[in-house]
Design a protein with these regions (language model features):
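Cytosolic-facing loops and C-terminal tails of multi-pass membrane proteins
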Residues: 2-58
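Structured C-terminal helix/loop/strand segments within mature extracytoplasmic catalytic/sensor domains
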Residues: 45-68, 72, 162-167, 208-236, ...
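Short pre-catalytic segments that frame enzyme active sites
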Residues: 47-102, 118
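Flexible glycine/proline-enriched surface loops and loop-helix/loop-strand junctions
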Residues: 91-97, 141-142, 150-157, 184-191, ...
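Active-site SXXK
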Residues: 99-124, 148, 270
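Short glycine/serine- and small hydrophobic-enriched flexible loop segments
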Residues: 112-120, 162, 205-212
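Short, well-structured active-site flanking segments
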Residues: 115-132, 218-221
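Mid-domain, small-residue-enriched loop/turn segments at the edges of structured enzyme/sensor domains
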Residues: 137, 144-145, 157-208
Length: 287
């Protein structure tokens, strides 16, 4: 465990000079790094009416840990998956199976769907800006998969969806088993604090399938997505990840960082999430 912590710290501490400018939700990423360094928990809010992932935990190798002292006023769970040893470390299984909106973390798979259908390709992922004025300067420009993922450009992935069509998107969501597979929300925002939800454990399972290409998709498409979510590299390994921020009435209520660290001899999957408990009543009412 100490060796793993050291590797995570070394990788996470290396950042390109322009990284802060390129990645939307950098605050969430910094928080994640701090949490990792202290082996502190993934934090989430609890709502009795939220759907849950029915995980067959009895067939898994799980180490249950107690990180209660780190929570303060929050409730939640910590999830870590060690791929080589096939071991899960979990604090609070109830929160680890709780499904919430994926927000921009879903863009990993939306991009993959677009690549599989040829809407974009690894060689040509260009989509022209339509001239509409967006709240973030980086969004007001033509985009490629790399730039759209780095700046979390909503309109780029909405354009991919529009070209795919709801039927094809839903087929892919079912094929990979994405969370609750619920696209009943508005087609432009079903993944943004709407109908589509996923749990931290499911996020890890899907990232594992992405890493191993258990989907059976074209290898060049898998690699294109992995390249788009690569955050930093060092001699000890490479950090991949994606942030996601949920907003209700102009306030951030749900922040994700999902990702994994690939070293020479292992891969560690890390999906911490932070939700402000004070915002929960308003957020759940608006879902």
């Amino acid at each position: 465990m100490k060796q793993m912590k050291r590797r995570i710290i070394n990788i996470a501490s290396y950042e390109k000079p322009t990284f802060c400018k390129k990645l939307k939700g950098m605050t969430a990423f910094i928080l994640t790094t701090v949490l990792i360094m202290g082996l502190t928990p993934f934090i989430s809010t609890y709502a009795a009416d939220e759907s849950r992932y029915q995980w067959k935990s009895s067939s898994e190798n799980i180490s249950y840990v107690d990180f209660s002292k780190y929570f303060g006023k929050y409730e939640g769970s910590f999830v870590l998956y060690d791929l080589r040893n096939d071991v899960w470390s979990i604090h609070d299984i109830e929160h680890a199976t709780l499904r919430v909106a994926p927000d921009s973390t879903y863009k990993i798979y939306d991009a993959l769907f677009g690549l599989e259908e040829g809407v974009i390709t690894p060689q040509d992922s260009f989509i022209a800006w339509n001239g509409e004025n967006y709240p973030f300067e980086a969004w007001n420009a033509d985009q490629t998969l790399q730039s759209a993922m780095a700046s979390s450009v909503n309109w780029y992935f909405q354009s991919v969806d529009e070209q795919l069509g709801a039927s094809d998107v839903y087929s892919y969501i079912q094929e990979i088993g994405y969370g609750n597979e619920n696209m009943s929300g508005d087609f432009s925002s079903y993944w943004m604090e709407s109908s589509l939800e996923i749990s931290p454990i499911e996020q890890v399972e899907l990232l594992t399938k992405l890493q191993n290409n258990s989907f059976g998709f074209a290898p060049e498409n898998i690699n294109a997505v992995k390249d788009a979510i690569r955050l930093s590299s060092s001699d000890t390994g490479t950090l991949y990840g994606k942030t996601g921020t949920g907003r209700v009435n102009g306030q951030d209520v749900n922040g994700w960082f999902i990702g994994y660290i690939e070293t020479a001899d292992n891969t560690y999957f890390l999906p911490p999430t932070l939700v402000q408990t004070a915002m929960l009543p308003e957020a759940t009412q608006l879902k």
